[in-house]
């Protein structure tokens, strides 16, 4: 009997020993082959040129933890108003889902049915929003690395141009999208494919350069943490508290300056901003219609006060131009301005209270041409014909010309065409700047007929018009008889460009209309005649 008790006791002890001791020993974590460090430890490295930095875009580069604004940009710009409203309505439910499920849902809502060939949001619109969300401290660390590898859960088409072209990241590993017949299905490839692509990149890096691999990710990214731990000797983790203390990357420190960008949205579409935008839309439609009707039909003495009352701010700065503006002249004045929106000539007319002004344009929609209260004439891009047309218009009154040939939203001036310097003795440079809150009044790939309407949809748009000191044209008596008159034309055009740039604090460039449209729309910007 006592022997049975002893055997039973031994069995119980052996069971407990196996269950608690051996089980714990067998399932304990293996010794880690990497070091876990806080992200601020990276700043202690004096030289990272012999290291390959592998970082998670959402967790370690961008300040914001929310991906909603980027998918809202895709939904609004590529899918339209209804799709973006649908995404906003479903966002409360998406926020309750897991990270992976919420991401897949937003991809489905934003990309389903979008044609691949016409999708240019990732190249022309999204880089602006991503750049405005980059943390300065982390960017400075990445800039010191010998090679940078970006890993992201976002679709490759959303992040590739932003990382490669604007941040000069050598390798970008994102998730591919499934397609049928050239249309996106709104379904991203499984994470296993992302891991396979990442594994291939890392193996090539190991065999090719032999650099030490350092991983940078977030505490909130367990999938990337396990992925990095397989290959990296060191892993640095970014906390949310670290991100809150980061500064935003300034524009003057962009590796490649952001000169051109497209899209209608001028505000970052966070959930709150998007909700405010849709709540404002009904009032904006009524306000824009009132501004359009009364602004075009009332005399300037009544139109200007009404537009100011409706929220449009117009500022005019004039330096002793009364002799040019008010005096009777045989020929009109040539006002040469930089190009911000299609409304530039109209606001010069409003500012000077002169309704008999005329404007020449390189491209203008039929609707805008019909609605314009001042006469507009299209240029043919034939130098002789355009010069004759401008001289004829000057004989009839004042003329406004935008020699850039297209608009630019950022503080840069495109190259000025020298044609204007040949048609008038006295040129009045005009520096123009405009600001909006919700919508841009320009587009490269959208419908240009809606440009003025989108500008008027803003609650408080503003225009600043500065008349600068007059400049002598190449047709003046001082320039006649010069052997190389073509060189004088370019010198006058460059001088006017620099005067306007200095007045606005803008940087002068040699970029042209063709450069802009090749980047934003994939064409050379020439409007086909119908």
From Swiss-Prot:
Pathway: Phospholipid metabolism; CDP-diacylglycerol biosynthesis; CDP-diacylglycerol from sn-glycerol 3-phosphate: step 1/3. It is found in: Membrane. It is a multi-pass membrane protein. Its EC number is 2.3.1.15. Belongs to the GPAT/DAPAT family. The keyword Transport does not apply. It comes from Arabidopsis thaliana (Mouse-ear cress). InterPro entries: HAD_RAM2/GPAT1-8, Plipid/glycerol_acylTrfase. It catalyses: sn-glycerol 3-phosphate + an acyl-CoA = a 1-acyl-sn-glycero-3-phosphate + CoA. GO terms for molecular function: glycerol-3-phosphate 2-O-acyltransferase activity; glycerol-3-phosphate O-acyltransferase activity. PANTHER family: ANCIENT UBIQUITOUS PROTEIN (PTHR15486), GLYCEROL-3-PHOSPHATE ACYLTRANSFERASE 2-RELATED (PTHR15486:SF62). One of its GO terms (biological process) is CDP-diacylglycerol biosynthetic process. This is Probable glycerol-3-phosphate acyltransferase 2. The chain crosses the membrane at residues 70-90, 93-113, 275-295. GO terms for cellular component: membrane. Esterifies acyl-group from acyl-ACP to the sn-1 position of glycerol-3-phosphate, an essential step in glycerolipid biosynthesis.
């Amino acid at each position: 009997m006592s022997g049975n008790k002893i055997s039973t006791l031994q069995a119980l002890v052996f069971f407990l020993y196996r269950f608690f001791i051996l089980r714990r020993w067998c399932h304990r974590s293996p010794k880690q082959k990497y070091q876990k460090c806080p992200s601020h430890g990276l700043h202690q490295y004096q030289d990272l040129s012999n290291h390959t930095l592998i970082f998670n875009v959402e967790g370690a580069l961008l300040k914001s933890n929310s991906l909603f604004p980027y998918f809202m940009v895709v939904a609004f710009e590529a899918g339209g108003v209804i799709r973006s409203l649908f995404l906003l309505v479903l966002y409360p439910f998406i926020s309750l889902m897991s990270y992976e499920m919420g991401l897949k849902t937003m991809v489905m809502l934003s990309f389903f049915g979008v044609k691949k060939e016409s999708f240019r949001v990732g190249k022309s619109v999204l880089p602006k929003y991503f750049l405005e969300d980059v943390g300065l401290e982390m960017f400075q660390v990445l800039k010191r690395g010998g090679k940078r590898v970006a890993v992201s859960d976002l679709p490759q088409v959303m992040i590739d141009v932003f990382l490669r072209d604007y941040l000069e990241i050598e390798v970008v590993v994102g998730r591919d999208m499934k397609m049928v017949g050239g249309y996106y299905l709104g379904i991203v490839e499984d994470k296993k494919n992302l891991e396979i692509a990442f594994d291939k990149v890392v193996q090539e890096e190991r065999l090719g350069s032999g650099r030490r691999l350092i991983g940078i990710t977030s505490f909130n990214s367990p999938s990337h943490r396990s992925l990095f731990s397989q290959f990296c000797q060191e892993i640095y983790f970014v906390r949310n508290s670290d991100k809150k203390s980061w500064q935003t990357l300034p524009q003057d420190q962009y590796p490649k300056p952001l000169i051109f960008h497209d899209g209608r949205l001028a505000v970052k579409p966070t959930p709150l901003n998007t909700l405010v935008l849709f709540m404002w839309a009904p009032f904006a439609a009524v306000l824009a219609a009132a501004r359009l009707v009364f602004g075009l039909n009332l005399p300037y003495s009544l139109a200007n006060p009404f537009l100011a009352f409706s929220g449009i701010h117009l500022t005019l700065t004039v330096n002793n131009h009364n002799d040019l503006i008010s005096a009777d002249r045989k020929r009109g004045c040539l006002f040469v301005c930089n190009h911000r929106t299609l409304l530039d000539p109209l606001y010069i007319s409003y500012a000077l209270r002169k309704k008999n002004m005329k404007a020449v344009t390189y491209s203008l929609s039929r609707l805008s041409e019909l609605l314009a209260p001042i006469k507009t004439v299209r240029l043919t891009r034939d130098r002789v014909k355009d010069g004759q047309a401008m001289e004829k218009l000057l004989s009839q009154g004042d003329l406004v010309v935008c020699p850039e040939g297209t608009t630019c939203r950022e503080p840069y001036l495109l190259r000025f065409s020298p044609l204007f310097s040949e048609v008038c003795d006295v040129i009045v440079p005009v520096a123009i700047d405009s600001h909006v809150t919700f919508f841009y009044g320009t587009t490269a790939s959208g419908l240009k007929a809606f440009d003025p309407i989108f500008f008027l949809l803003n609650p408080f748009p503003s225009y600043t018009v500065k008349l600068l000191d007059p400049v002598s044209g190449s047709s003046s008596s001082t320039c006649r008889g010069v052997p190389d008159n073509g060189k004088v034309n370019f010198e006058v055009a460059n001088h006017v460009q620099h005067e306007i740039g200095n007045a606005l604090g803008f940087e002068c460039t040699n970029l042209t209309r063709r450069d802009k449209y090749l980047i934003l729309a994939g064409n050379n910007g020439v409007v086909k005649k119908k």
